[in-house]
């Protein structure tokens, strides 16, 4: 089993498309009215985010206070890619913090709708973040959208 797609509601579709392109390199696959699909180019398997614009509303609450996605977590292919993402988040004043585990390092930020975005990377350049690393329940990760 692997990540194929997620669907997320956004307030401003254009703003979100720009953010996910410039920060993570996701490219537009399709767009129709207030719906868009973006993908991670270069991936061996399709990885798609489908975004639906809900528009702005003062009653809409972002982050962990709404039903929907709490955090979007990516495993970067290299420490250089992680540094590029962290720099872009910082440039946008969206970087919340950096965090290191025993076998990984990560940058925690927020997208334009205040959803938590996390880019992580294994400290071993020959492997992804392991299942064992996920078994070490890091309170910061699970509380990131609080």
Task: Give, region by region, the residue ranges found by the protein language model.
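N-terminal beta-strand motif that seeds the catalytic metal site of vicinal oxygen chelate
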Residues: 1-14, 44, 69-72, 125-146
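Conserved short beta-strand elements that form part of the metal-binding/catalytic scaffold
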Residues: 27-66, 109-110, 115-123
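Conserved acetyl-CoA-binding loop of GNAT-fold acetyltransferases
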Residues: 23-29, 94
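Vicinal oxygen chelate
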Residues: 2-11, 60-146
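Conserved active-site tyrosine of GNAT-family acetyltransferases
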Residues: 16-21, 114
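Short amphipathic alpha-helices in soluble, non-transmembrane regions
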Residues: 21-23, 85-90
């Amino acid at each position: 089993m692997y990540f194929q797609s997620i669907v997320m509601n956004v307030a401003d579709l254009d703003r979100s498309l720009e953010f996910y392109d410039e920060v993570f390199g996701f490219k537009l696959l399709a767009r129709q009215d207030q719906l868009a699909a973006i993908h991670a180019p270069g991936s061996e398997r399709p990885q798609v985010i489908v975004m639906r614009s809900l528009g702005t509303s003062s009653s809409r609450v972002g982050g962990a206070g709404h039903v929907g996605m709490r955090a979007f977590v990516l495993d970067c292919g290299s420490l250089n890619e992680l540094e590029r993402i962290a720099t872009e988040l910082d440039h946008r004043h969206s970087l919340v913090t950096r965090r290191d585990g025993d076998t990984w390092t990560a940058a925690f930020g927020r997208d334009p709708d205040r959803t938590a975005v996390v880019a992580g990377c294994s400290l071993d350049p020959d492997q992804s973040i392991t299942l064992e690393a996920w078994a070490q329940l890091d309170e910061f990760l699970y509380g990131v959208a609080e």
